Amino acid sequence: MAFSDYKHIYQVQTDYQIEYQEDNFLIIAEYNPSNQIIAELEFNQKNIDIFSSEAARCETIIFPILREVYQNYAEKTALWIQKSIAYDEKLNGTPDYMISKRSPLGKTMLELPLFIIVEAKKNDFEQGWGQCLAELVAVKNMNGRDKQSIYGIVTDGKLWEFGKLVDKIFSKNSDSFILNELSKLLGALKFIFDEVTKEIV
């Protein structure tokens, strides 16, 4: 069974006894986008059919936005694209994007995963969260730290939803964020990067 076989959150809840709740755990300070990201997104939206496929959304929207914030944390963290992970026969697969602790051995070594980003296939957020929560459970078990917050994001490029798993409790942030409010979206990402880098010893 792979992460993508989980189509709904309740399937992961049933298999792993995960409690579900909603609250606003993100503390947002608006982030001033760089001229580079503004120009890149404007160019892409003007010249490319950015919503024509999953690959188009990932390459022209999702990755540039992640990179915009990630570059400020590159000394401590590593950004992975389509990096396969496996905890056991049921919890395995390939997250779209993953942030981990940066290994002292270099960028080719995967250290503790810190958060996961899932592209919502066919704009299906319900399935996206089923897959994302399965990935969060795998990461929590791989890390062996029940009390550590593991963050997840599900996005179709336009809409960004956030969640976190702590021990057996999954919290979905009540507020979501949209591409057209870029500074708030980047602020939400910055909050998560700030939180996960606190976990790095």
Protein language model annotation of sequence segments:
Residues 151-154:
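A short beta-strand->alpha-helix segment at the C-terminal rim
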